[in-house]
Amino acid sequence: MALLTLLAKNATAIFICSTFASLLFYVVYQRYFHPLAKYPGPFLASITDLWQVYQYLTLKQPYTLTTLHEKYGPFVRYGPDKLSTTCESAVSIIYQKGGRNMPKTEFYDAYGAAHPNVFGMRNETLHSVRRRHMSHSFSISYVKEMEQYLDLNIAIMKEKLARYASTGEIFDLKKAFHYYVIDTLGELAFSQSFGVQVADDESLIPPVKEHSLLAAATGAWPAMLPQLKKWLPLVPYKPLRDLFQGRRACADLASRCVRERLLDLADVKDDEASLRLQRKDILTSLILAKHPDTGERLTEMDLETEAFGFM
């Protein structure tokens, strides 16, 4: 018994010492020998992604990163393997010349890796094809065609501002512009305003913030992302449940918009003259777009994921 007790104590001691030594080795490596060790940044950020998760959950991430750049300069290490830069010359290197050498990271998987849209798509080949599907929707000619719908929402906003000015009522200018942007995006993407400006009702805004916060916070911890996706929906914590509820609401709205638009186009002849008569919006352009090589159109699932991304 004495021998077993001694072995048990030694095993526990060995485990504790091994764990401590491993952690110490990891910290020393991250701080002094990692390829990003030469770049400045917070100590905790250099050893764990949980630092960034905390920044997102407390809604401080953009402000903290700005402060860090003011303190350290154009390059800041904000994660064990993450580097932030404000260097203008890096933009073309990363986004234009980087291409396949600098693909999107696992962070984007949090935005829907099971069936990703053009925003979260990490496969460069598929991403390139999808961008070609959508190219017309972001052309100058298309934007000019949509000016009438922009003008419509501008008129609503101008009328509200004029009313506030005549009555002397105090109002939130930032919120007024936010409402305008939301309704305009609805017109551009789905040919329908969300009616936020007219109703002056913030609850009509799609709960995009909830989805974005959930994706950012979980995507910031890529090593645990599969487990987080699996188990977080089961956690009985109301603020967390609210985030998942917001994500589901956005997905349901995207699906509904796609179904309604497909129904509207169901009886339209598939010829250039008939299609030209249809009201233009980003979703319709995507529905009618064909694969540049095969001529195939996107599936309903593809359309729903892209509509989800429009929000």
Which residues fall in each region the model found?
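Cytochrome P450 heme-thiolate monooxygenase catalytic core
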Residues: 104-111, 145-311
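Short, histidine-centered active-site or binding-site loop motifs used for metal coordination
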Residues: 51, 138, 290
